């Protein structure tokens, strides 16, 4: 695993962000897409109005967490996921944002299962999310 300071460019959705990564010595990787490792949030770009509502709530919560700056990304395997995104855990100060999204029921644990396998968990989360 590798650890880098980074600056938020934009929140794409509840489990994906774009950041500029500080490699040190004044070297930066600009506008890198990060997929938050080990979590899945409802889709914010979908024709399912109910899922979209919860997906947008997850995106909004992610934005609230990251507005403070002082971000750090801990990458996993220094590799990219199936859609070409860097996989990592995002921290603000010492708070693991991946874990907080699950704790607050905006996300479920995800380790390669199919969408069908985690659909029930997403439905259960809807009962606990304040929108």
Predicted stretch roles:
Residues 1-131:
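Small beta-barrel nucleic-acid-binding modules, primarily SNase/OB-fold domains
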């Amino acid at each position: 695993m590798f650890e880098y300071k980074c600056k938020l460019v934009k929140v794409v959705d509840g489990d994906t962000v774009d950041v500029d990564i500080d490699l040190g010595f004044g070297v930066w990787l600009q506008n890198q897409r990060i997929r938050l490792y080990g979590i899945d949030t409802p889709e914010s770009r979908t024709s399912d109005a109910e899922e979209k509502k919860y997906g947008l709530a997850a995106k909004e919560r992610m934005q609230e967490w990251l507005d403070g700056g002082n971000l750090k990304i801990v990458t996993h395997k220094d590799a990219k996921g199936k859609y070409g995104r860097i996989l990592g855990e995002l921290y603000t100060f010492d708070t693991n944002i991946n874990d907080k999204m699950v704790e607050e029921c905006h996300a479920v644990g995800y380790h390669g299962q199919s969408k069908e396998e985690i659909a029930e968990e997403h439905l259960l989360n809807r009962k606990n999310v304040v929108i």
